[in-house]
């Protein structure tokens, strides 16, 4: 167990119906907290502030910088950046709230095929920080999987696929009985 009180910043990712927070000291994660959340409820800075305060309350931390990826587009000034571009912007967009000093990391947008990455750009940046000269494709599996083409340190293009999410929507992953289609005729 690490001393979460030594954290000097927080990393936050909003993904699908999950809010995940890492208490960080430099480049090391000290603690992680995850909560299920209704993305429809995170429609304002004050709603996000309340959800984050509830999730981090057990840590009893002072006011720290909080870097956030994956927020819904529209309620911050962090306009998505068009690819090709670096995975993360030089500067995040400040969004102070009652309890936190949020720094919103802009999403990535693609014109054709139309696409938006909210949160995956930070995982790509993390991969590239460990693989400086990477030139190729990065696959990020998850409820929505991302395949991103990387060249010269930039995200050139990307494609997303509803893998796990689609499987959940279709059922428990077991094939239907052979008569299931016959019954619909």
Labelled PLM ranges:
Residues 40, 107-137, 144-185:
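Glycine-rich phosphate-binding loop plus the immediately following alpha-helix
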Residues 2-6, 15, 57-63, 97-98, ...:
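Flexible, charged surface loops at secondary-structure boundaries
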Residues 25, 31-39, 50:
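Ser/Thr/Asn(+Pro)-rich, low-complexity disordered segments
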